[in-house]
C-alpha cells in the first residue's frame, strides 16, 4: 500500500511566449528602467544580469516563471523589474550574485510573486530562489528564498535583509493576492509525474474526510470480524479443523494489515511528508509485505487441502501437518520480504523533488521511499517477489486447484435412491457449499489487490506518465489502496454465511466471558472439511478395509455437560465397520451419521437380532459405530428381580455394581439413552416405540455414553458372552475396551429429556 517511489526526473519545459505582465512599481533608492508589460520582462532581467556580468549564473532546470509569477492584472500597473521567462532556459532557481541587482529589483520580483501565490503560501513548494543583499563591500551572499508565507513581510525582510521600502511593498502586495494553482506542480520522477504543489496535504479537506471515514469503517469491521473468527475456532473444540486452522492464519494476517498498515496508509494519503518516523518507515512496508504474502500462502494451503480431500480422501492432512505448514508460511513470508525492511528509508524532500521545490518549514521534511544500492534493480525485485510470487503464480495455482475440484465434484455420479445414495448426495452438497465459500474468498482477494498491482506495474515498467494520466492516478491511487486494505474485512463477512461460524459469532456476542469455551457445538466446523469426512468417504468405497491405528486419533475427551452435570463415558475404538452409513438430520439442522449394520448379537434369551433395528414393542437393540464397533444390550426382567450389572475390562479392570431390586421391565425400557461419538459415527436407537428426536454429535475418535442407569457397552471385535442360568436370570453385562481408557458415569436422578449438547 505504499506509494510507488522514485527519483526526480527534471523535465524540460516548452518555451512560452511572454504575454503582458504588468507589475507594480515603487520609489526605490536605485531606479530601474521601466519596461513594457510582458514583452520586456525577459529583456529587463537579462539586462540586469548582463549589467551584473553574471548572466551565466542563471542555472539550468528553469521553472516556468510565467506560470509561477503570473502577474496580477488587477494591479493595472507596469513597472520596472521582471523575471526571466522561458528564454532563460530551464532553471528552478535564479541566482543573482552581483550588487548591481538591488533589493528594489528583488522587491519587485517578490511583489509580483507574492501577489499571485496562495493566500497561505506555505502550500507553495515550487519556489523562487533568489539571493541578494546590499552590503558595503558590494558583494551579495547567495541564499535560497522559499515563498512559505506570503502574508509575512517580516519573513522576507529577515531572510534577505531587505530595505523598509521593499518590505512595505511586499506587505501591500500580500494584501491583494490572486493566484491560480493549476500551473504549479511537483515533479516526481517515475514518469515525469507532476504532483500538486502543496507541501503538506495531498488532497482537499473534503476528500481527506471521505478517506478517513472509509478507512475507519474498514478498520473497525476488519478488526472485530477477524477477532471473532479467531475466537470461534479457538473457543469451540469442534471448530479446530485443518481448514479452519488456515482460516485463522488468514485472519491473523488480516489483523496485522489492519493494525499496522491501514493507519499508515491513511496518513500517507493525507500528508505528503512521512509523519511516522524512521522506524515506522522500515516497519510498515515490511509488515505489509509479510501479511500479504502470508494471506496468499494461506489461501494456497486451503485450496490444496480441499483438493487433496476431494481427489484422494485417504491422503488426509492432519492437524500436525497443518501447523507445520502454517509455520512454513510465516517463515517464507518473513524471508522473502526482507528487502523491504532493508531498502525502505527516509529521503529528504530536497533530494526527491527538483531544485525549485524547496521546503520552507523550519524542520526538514522527509519521504519514505525505496532506496536501492547503486547497480541494483528494484523493479526486478518488485516483478519477481511481489507481482509473480505473491500474486500471479499463487492465483494461477489456486485457480487450477478449484477447477480440478469442480471437475471431480460435478462428474461424480451417485446412482439409485437408497439411503446410502441420499447420504452421499448430502455430503457432496455440503462439500460444494464449502468450496463455493472458499472460491468467493479467493476471487475477492484477487479483485481487491488487482488495481493496486496494475498501478504499480504501470509506474515501474511503463513509459513516462503524462499530465492527464497523473491526474487520473492521483484520484485512483487512494481508492486502489483502500480496496487492497478492505480485503481484510471482507473475509469475516463471507464466513458469516456459513451456519457454524454464524452460530459461533452469536455465541460470542451472547457470552460474557472472552476466554471460556463456547456452549455452541456442532458436528463439524465446516461440513466435509474434517478428517472424519474423508474417512467416511473411504468407508463407502472400501467398507471391508480396516483403518490403521493413529496416535493422532487416540483422543479421549470428556465434556462437562451443564444439563446432566456429570461426566459421560468415553470409549476409543479402532476397529472397522463393514457396512454403510446413513445420514440423518435432526431438529437443530445438524447432519448426523447413522449406521446400517447387518451383524447380529444375541440377547439373554439367545435370540439373534439384527443390529440397529427397532421393534414396535421396544425389544432389545444394539448400537454400532463407524471406525469402532460398539453394541449395546440389556435384559428385560420380571418384577421383583434385581439387576446386577458387571462391567468387565478384559485388560484387568472389572467392577461389580449392585442395584436395587424391584425394577420392572417398563421402567427399564422407559429409560432414555444417549450416545455421542467424535470423529467416527454412532447410531442411536431409542427403547420406546414412539418416535423420538435424537441428537448425535461427532468429533475425534471418541465415543461417549450417558445413561440414567447402569448399562452395557460391548466392542464388536470379539463376541459378547452372556451368562445365563435356569433360574430367573440375572443378566451379566460385559464391557470391553481396546486401546484407551474408559470412563463411566451415571446418575441416580433420572432426566429423561435432557439434551446432551446445547
UniProtKB/Swiss-Prot annotation:
Where in the cell?
Answer: Cell membrane
Q: Which Gene3D superfamilies match?
A: Rhodopsin 7-helix transmembrane proteins
Any one cellular-component term (Gene Ontology)? membrane
Q: Which GO molecular-function terms appear in the entry?
A: G protein-coupled peptide receptor activity; G protein-coupled receptor activity; neuropeptide receptor activity; neuropeptide Y receptor activity
Q: Which residues lie on this side of the membrane: Extracellular?
A: 1-104, 234-254, 304-323, 408-436
Q: Which Pfam families match?
A: 7tm_1
List the keywords (alphabetical).
Answer: Behavior, Cell membrane, G-protein coupled receptor, Glycoprotein, Membrane, Receptor, Transducer, Transmembrane, Transmembrane helix
**Is Methyltransferase one of the keywords UniProt gives this record?**
no
Q: Which GO terms describe its biological process?
A: cellular response to hormone stimulus; determination of adult lifespan; G protein-coupled receptor signaling pathway; mating behavior, sex discrimination; neuropeptide signaling pathway
Biased segments, Basic residues type: 7-16
Record function comment: Receptor for the neuropeptide SIFamide. Modulates sexual behavior by playing a role in male sex discrimination. Also involved in promoting sleep.
Question: Mind telling me what this protein is named?
Answer: Neuropeptide SIFamide receptor
| Gene from which the chain derives | SIFaR
